Design a protein with these regions (language model features):
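Catalytic-site neighborhood detector that most strongly recognizes the C-terminal catalytic loop/helix
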Residues: 113, 169-173, 280-305
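C-terminal secondary-structure termini that scaffold catalytic or DNA-interacting sites
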Residues: 195-199, 213-220, 305-314
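Short, polar N-cap/turn motifs at the start of nucleic acid-interacting alpha helices
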Residues: 158-164, 252, 271-291
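Short, aromatic/basic-rich helix-turn unit that serves as a nucleic-acid recognition element
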Residues: 9-37, 67, 73, 81
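N-terminal DNA-binding recognition helix of tyrosine site-specific recombinases/integrases
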Residues: 40-44, 69-100, 145-147
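C-terminal catalytic core of Y-nucleophile DNA break-rejoin enzymes
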Residues: 172-193, 204-238
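Basic, Lys/Arg- and aromatic-enriched nucleic-acid-binding interface segment
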Residues: 98-149, 153
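Short, basic (Lys/Arg/His-rich) helix/loop patches that form interaction surfaces
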Residues: 129, 233-278
Length: 314
């Protein structure tokens, strides 16, 4: 079968169209990923003057070298752009074989978990205002089996019923049910927009959400989430310095640290890997699926309760 001819400019237009479709469907993160890819690819074809050239395996290799040597982006960023290019190209009827010699996997990044005594130190650290809120949300993420920041930002009051939190992970769409531990309830009560409605700094936040992150709906709400994520990570870096993180051989805190810390502490506490994977809502753990027929949410909740008690975070 003859390979369909697609030019670089046609591919660029298709990437932008996919971004618009995801934006209209309110899949804002995916739309942003396509827009980022479009910006990068547009810079490349403008620099090469190749808008009307055919997109083929040689283009892929040259774009890959451009990202490596001229833009000097990280390897996972190179792979990120190529994956979204490939998805669009294949959707247009192109053959994925043109990408066969390009790196489109994800290289594991170095992650550092917090030891238990640092979690305790964070909990007792005297902080005020937004620093206190971001610290508490970090601890909530840890206690909630490594809940991602995006899931905390969009967590609704209606997701909490009968002593349990039930929500779907934004990343995978997978539903999770988690027992509400006392330490989690305390944080929710402290920072709920309903509790803070008399505070002028928090009075305009959406009362339907658990945390004062989002004021609006749709694209504007997503922009507010992105701003909050940036503020969260910036505050965590400052808090890391205050808590003396360097003394533990660590350099910083980020939104991913709580998730990795829960998994690591759970592993050191003797919790089976299958339970850790299920507790974190992973979607591609093939080996884990073998164990899950007998694994109930109650078992995972029991393990999490034991873990939080073992480090004195109740």
């Amino acid at each position: 079968m003859r390979q369909k001819t697609i030019t670089n400019s046609q591919l660029l237009d298709a990437i932008r169209n996919r971004a618009n479709k995801f934006q209209s469907a309110e899949h804002f993160a995916t739309a942003q990923n396509y827009l980022s890819t479009a910006r990068s690819f547009n810079q490349y074809i403008n620099l090469r003057g190749s808008a009307h050239a055919q997109f083929n395996a040689a283009t892929v290799q040259d774009y890959y070298r451009y990202l490596q040597t001229e833009r000097r982006v990280l390897r996972n960023t190179q792979s990120f752009y190529l994956r979204f290019l490939r998805a669009t190209y294949c959707a247009m009827g192109g053959c994925a074989d043109v990408f066969k010699d390009a790196y489109t996997s994800v290289e594991p990044t170095r992650k550092r978990a917090l030891p238990a005594h640092v979690i305790k130190r964070l909990d007792s650290l005297p902080l005020k205002g937004n620093y206190a809120m971001w610290r508490d949300m970090f601890l909530f993420s840890f206690a909630d089996r490594g809940m991602a920041f995006v899931d905390m930002a969009y967590l609704r009051q209606s997701d909490i019923r009968g002593g349990y939190i039930t929500y779907c992970r934004h990343k995978t769409g997978r539903p999770l049910t988690i027992k509400l531990e006392p330490c989690m309830q305390q944080i929710i009560t402290r920072w709920s927009p309903t509790t803070l409605h008399t505070d002028t700094n928090h009075s305009n936040f959406h009362p339907g959400y658990v945390f004062p992150i989002i004021r609006s709906s749709g694209a504007k709400g997503f922009t507010e989430y992105q701003s909050a994520l940036s503020a969260y990570n910036k505050a965590l870096r400052s808090i890391a310095a205050r808590v003396g993180l360097a003394k533990s051989g660590l350099t910083t805190l980020s939104s991913y640290t709580a998730r990795h810390t829960w998994a690591t502490q759970a592993y050191h506490a003797g919790i089976p890997v299958s339970v850790i994977s299920e507790g974190m809502g992973h979607s591609t753990e093939k080996v884990t699926r073998i164990y899950l027929a007998q694994l109930t949410p109650t078992i995972i909740d029991r393990y999490n309760h034991t873990l939080l008690n073992s480090i004195g975070f109740r």
